[in-house]
């Protein structure tokens, strides 16, 4: 399984003899640090990249902080929020990589089904040299230890506080970003395939 480790426990209850927890990963040819001629500093801003849905709209409206949003479908928002700067449309791999590399924070909004597990952005953001800010849960903390490879939050109050903390301490944020970019290499889909084959053959 890849969606959540909890599925493995359910499979065991169903007496499935062999099951393997294989989390998502990243494509090393697509999700990579951009090849920039000049070294750039982060822009002291926050981004979220992803397709529009009502849950994400409500999340960002409730958070109510300045954030740049990229992805298809965001022109569907009926009520405009002055703090949400929208660039609606598809994002190619090169632009996606530049966004994650340039911004001080890349926010990962976990959907309801992911709240206690992980999603693709858990790996893709650090692979592109982004600084991952994601919801706190055991599964993600096992993959990327909090305050070592990423930042985590529990609720809106802590999320706002954590954003201020990250922007105020760029030195620590830079260390965490670099450590995560190195750590994530073991989670490429190439390595996932090697692991799977070693357990099946």
What does each model-found stretch correspond to?
Residues 168-200:
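A charged, aromatic-enriched C-terminal amphipathic alpha-helix characteristic of glycosyltransferases
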Residues 156-159, 176:
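Catalytic phosphate/metal-binding cores of nucleic-acid and nucleotide-processing enzymes, i.e., regions
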Residues 150-156, 165-170:
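Conserved acidic donor-binding segment of nucleotide-sugar-dependent glycosyltransferases
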Residues 7, 121, 162, 179-180:
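Short, hydrophobic/aromatic alpha-helical segments in well-folded domains
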Residues 125, 150, 180:
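Hydrophobic, well-ordered secondary-structure elements that form the walls
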Residues 58-65, 153, 184, 199-201:
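Alpha-helix C-terminal capping segments
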Residues 1-146, 195:
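Nucleotide-sugar donor-binding catalytic core of glycosyltransferases
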């Amino acid at each position: 399984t890849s969606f959540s480790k909890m599925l493995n426990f359910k499979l065991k209850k169903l007496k499935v003899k062999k099951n393997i927890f294989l989390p998502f990963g990243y494509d090393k040819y697509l999700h990579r640090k951009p090849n920039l001629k000049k070294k750039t500093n982060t822009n002291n801003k926050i981004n979220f990249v992803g397709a529009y849905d009502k849950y994400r709209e409500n999340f960002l409206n409730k958070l109510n902080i300045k954030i740049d949003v990229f992805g298809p479908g965001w022109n569907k928002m009926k009520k405009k929020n002055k703090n949400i700067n929208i660039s609606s449309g598809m994002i190619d791999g090169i632009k996606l990589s530049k966004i994650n590399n340039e911004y001080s924070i890349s926010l990962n909004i976990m959907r309801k089904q992911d709240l206690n597990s992980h999603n693709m952005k858990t790996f893709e953001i650090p692979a592109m040299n982004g600084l991952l800010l994601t919801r706190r849960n055991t599964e993600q903390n096992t993959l990327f230890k909090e305050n070592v490879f990423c930042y985590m939050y529990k609720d809106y109050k802590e999320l706002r506080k954590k954003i201020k903390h990250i922007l105020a301490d760029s030195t620590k944020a830079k260390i965490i970003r670099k450590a995560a970019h190195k750590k994530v290499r073991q989670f490429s889909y190439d390595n996932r395939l090697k692991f799977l084959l070693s357990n099946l053959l």
